[in-house]
Amino acid sequence: MEKRLSDSPGDCRVTRSTMTPTLRLDQTSRQEPLPQQPDNGPAAAPGKSKSPTPLPGKSQAAQHHQFRAPQQQQGPKNRNKAWSKRQHKAGGKHNPSACVGASSGQAQSTGSSVIAATLLPTAASAHKADLENIQNIHNKNLTAGGGVNHHGNAGTAHHGGGGGAGAHHAAAGGHHHHHNTRLAQNAAAGGASGGGTIQMHKKMLRGHHHHVLCAGNNANHTCCLVTGCNGSSIGGVGVAGSGGATASAGGGGASCKEAQSCKDTSSLSGNSSIAGSAGAGNAVHYCCGRSKFFLPEKRLRKEVIVPPTKFLLGGNISDPLNLNSLQNENTSNASSTNNTPATTPRQSPITTPPKVEVIIPPNIHDPLHLLDPVDSMEYEKQLTSPMKRAGPGGGMLHHRQHHYRTRKNRKRRRFDSNNTSHAGDEGGVGSELTDEPPLPAATSSLAASPVAAPLNVGGSLLLSESAAPAPGETAEMGQQQEQAHVHSPQSASTTTTAAEMPTPTPTSAAAATATAEHKEQSAPAPTATSSPQRQQQHVAAAAEELPTPETSAAAETPAEEMLLSCSATSASLVASTLAERRASRDLRLDLSSTCYGVGGTGLSFGGSISSSVGSSFGGGGRKRKISESSTSQKSKKFHRHDAMDKIVSPVVPQPGAWKRPPRILQPSGARKPSTRRSTSVSESELLSPVEEQPPKQLPLIGVEIPRDDTPDLPDHGLGSPLSTTSGATSHTAGEQDSLAGVDISMGDTLGSGVVGKAPLTSSLMLEPAKIPPIKMLPKFRADGLKYRYGNFDRYVDFRQMNEFRDVRLQVFQRHVELFENKDILDIGCNVGHMTITVARHLAPKTIVGIDIDRELVARARRNLSIFVRIPKEEKLLEVKAEPTVDAKANIAVKDETSGAAHKKTRRGKRRRKVHQGIHHHHHHHHDLEQLQQQQKLNSLLVKPHEFFPISFPLTYGRIPRILSSSKSPNMLGNKNQFPANVFFRHTNYVLKDESLMASDTQQYDLILCLSVTKWIHLNFGDNGLKMAFKRMFNQLRPGGKLILEAQNWASYKKKKNLTPEIYNNYKQIEFFPNKFHEYLLSSEVGFSHSYTLGVPRHMNKGFCRPIQLYAKGDYTPNHVRWSDAYYPQTPYEAYRGIYATLPVHRMGGGGSSAGGSNSGHAQMLHLSSSSRSQNYDTPHYAGSASGSASCRQTPMYQPTYNPLETDSYQPSYDMEYLNHMYVFASPLYQTVWSPPASLRKSSSHTPVFGSVRDAELDGDGSGGGGSGGGSYHRHVYPPNDDTCSPNANACNAFNSIRDADTDDSNQLPGGSRRHVYATNCGESSSSPQVNHHDAVGEFVDGLMDDEQKSSTGGGTGGAAYCDLSDA
């Protein structure tokens, strides 16, 4: 191996040494030689270990090379030199640079990390680091992919040594974080075998973190975010500049700060979890993003741009559309009539690639992902074609590093895969131990879940990715945290757990450490936060010190366990390799690979295992990559396609086009990760390591999937390496699987490898579970109790952000007929603006606003008082003049007596007033006298606007008092003039007991329930809201309407933390807003149909809620039979559109009172209008007022449905709903009934009398003539068996015409009206009819008979007679 350790960073080039993964084996030179390590092939030679796991005591000479693999630098034997570019070159594909990272991990353990840290900056200084170096490093890393050598250091090596200049995987355990998919593959192949060669790519290899590039600039570190490269080199050296990415890697010696930085970076890169374990390597990589060594053009490119090679039109790269082929065609062919080429265009010289990309959508049934457009980014990831993606895999990753890259989304995806692969790399440490390749799946799963960590240090580390820089590191970290004043008992327990866990081998120890670290992470944030550097260093130390109680216990574990972990690691490596491969091949849908949590180990190869682990742990089998990432919890629900390959298509939404994962809880919000993954890192940061660690906790949070729901997340582990782990945990968290589930999956995964170990892992997992779950109650707002009912005093200000008035009024003004002369109830009136505005502009008879907040009701009354005009009386003026004198005296006294400074202003005002009063006193008197005189004069004079020539009445006749006559007698005086028609009451509309609803009366024609349902729901639960709906229905008169503006479910979440009661109710809600409609139209409530009045536009989309109108049936005596109360069991569909009316022939003057015999009773009944409605539930009440109204039905095309004026089942709104086609056919003529012209005029539908209710009552007065004024309409009956088809025989059809109805003189004062049965042509019709029972015909006939009999009997007869129309 050509190792050139140049002390100067400039010289530090990773030569392409032919180093093979052997170096990784060197890592085996952990304190306890791992039998497995030798498995890595030539690398096994400890002496050879490139990233030598320096013996704990050794401080390896820091190697100054741009790659800053701190481990390598530390490597005493210049093994790290492999990092040098040339070595890399020499190594060609076989560079064991990864080993360097591993060794440096050991070195770090030794404490050489500090040196490494120092060197790294120097390395950073080195200009020579360039893409080539990075590539070399990557190659080396790939070779080192085994990471076993590093693993040798109690798992420190690769992970711990992640700081190794070239060991991009420093924590990767030899996986080398192959950001570049191909590199990852190669590394997996080579690294796993330990002897495998890694192809040297001039391009940055995706699999490798090209740490070298980042000379150690913090800025650089951001660039290198790609694959969690941020993780600083083990030494922490790696990227001091990288913002502590190194620390995150926990390269043993990395400082906590760096670790935090790494975490952030890695989060940016999307490898937050990786950041911790592989952080060191990551850190380097992260540095490379903006390495000063690279000129801008030399920056890592996401990929080398691969020009398209497939031209469907036969063109080539310079003529993609094959336009040149048109030049050769005959002019005739080019003529406008025939533009198609005579022949298929010849193919361009550039041949189509032999491989045809086949993009398989994740959901074959929804290839364009239109059904669930949750996150375009994820979906695109799923669809990206493998070919495009595979290209320069590393480039993609790098792009991820670069926030500014346009394709960063894809990178992220890739990155995720890489991250998984990264995890795999870390797992790779174990992987180098490749001794037991058979366990790859288990290993991958192990890597996938931090829980597995105890078993597979490498794998588990991998899983924790960044959580535990290296198994050893982890162990140390656990110890250290223990030692390092674990701030939280949890962290202490974590360490203890690590100690307790008797991991059989150093690897096991590392795993234990990792476990401890995981625990730490699960431990409260403070622990995590407790100097991530320290933790990392401790981890490194632990790796070295495997002997430490925990570590020693781990070390004690049998070598076989070591092997197991090793195999697990190799499995992880394989998994990561596969993941990378997958990443490279966009076509593959790597759900698991997308799963960050699984750490990529589960990507392709750990599929099942990783999915089991990952699913339990939040990583492997999940669909959402992001979920897996630390962010996964946050954005868990948003990133569905993260795992999928992306397709670039004008149809398929491009990444980020749909929904960006919420960055809400990112503590690192300021730094926007280049990828969503970065969010995941932030998320991990958000979660306290402890919180993150316990999958259970996360699952708890998982319910409220967006992490933002859990307030504490942001607090914890923001800067701690644990936070990186938290990334892994996040995956776990993202998975809602319970810890137990995780344990089980872990057990299964490991079980294949080592049955004995599975229990350990499970116990480990359980331990994190023991840590208090995140399920803590959220922090409730201080003002939550005050505003628990949504009684915001500034609510109107929010509603009217973009309008001078409430946008809902625009909708109401299009349906004025719903309000005019109606008794209205406004539930939740707040400060009364809507109530007052409706009263002013829509002329209701009365409107009552109620609210549960007494203060708001008081303010509403004050607001109303503004509109109450108090007439000025002259007496008042005089009286005021006198008090001014008294006031003057009083004020003078006050001025003398009160010395309070705060009263000065008031006093001054008072004084001024008094003086003015005194001064102008006489003037006022004069003014009053003049005013009085002027008023007297005015009273004698006729004002111009009041002037009406006396000759006009003589010449043209008197002006008929139309208005007064049209007004119903009920409208006494100013009853519905504005200020007098508004009332406010303080009350809770939700009754304590449903039995209290029995006392409700039908007193309203219209109920407004605007933006109140959410607050009723949150405060009183499902039962309270249902009770409120029932009460609304009960309080509506027949034909009454409910205008409902319900908040959508998404808005509930924002208010669930107001009070503990609301929080609990929120958790228990099962009656979601999308079920309101069905419920209101169900027999339990009884509304007959609904109609959408409109959806107001508002700048705040939260206020753009549809306004629904629900109509209560018109229960005339005959209608009652069809009413829900009368026949509650009657099955009918939600939308009834069965009734239509034939032309209205109004007789007698305009008023119902003029309607013949009705007139006498009409006035008397008008007075009882409010009470009559109470009788609706009984078939008989005074007169058939509603009967008459029901006859007066609005045609189906009319947009509004006037209460009491139309049949409750009229189809006016149904025509537009759900393609319900109601054709009203007259069985007589078998033709489709259409309203006559007279019906098409709205005037024919509005009663001449003032109120519709009055009109109805008018009819009642006549005893039977319930339909006042002879305004009888023919009724179209619902179909029965005889008439249900247009072909119904004429006999039945004629029988259905009720001659009896016509004969009833009481009913038909205005003339005869006939009823025609309607045929419901749509099966979906929701007619009230008894649905298609054979008895329907008999039933209808029976009704008809009853009507005929009752029709003869006076008023009640008329009522009973009413019509079958309701039937």
From Swiss-Prot:
Residue numbers of Phosphothreonine PTMs: T1116
Disulfide bonds: none
Source organism (scientific name): Drosophila melanogaster (Fruit fly)
Compositionally biased spans, kind Basic and acidic residues: 705-715
A GO cellular component annotation in the UniProt record: nucleus
UniProt keywords, alphabetically: Methyltransferase, Phosphoprotein, S-adenosyl-L-methionine, Transferase
Protein name listed in UniProt: 7SK snRNA methylphosphate capping enzyme bin3
Documented EC number(s): 2.1.1.-
EC top class named in words: transferase
Residues annotated as domain Bin3-type SAM: 806-1115
Composition bias, Polar residues: 15-31, 527-538, 1166-1177, 1185-1203
Amino-acid positions noted as binding S-adenosyl-L-methionine in the UniProt annotation, renumbered to this chain: R808, G828, C829, N830, D851, I852, N988, Y989, L1010
CDD domains per UniProt: AdoMet_MTases
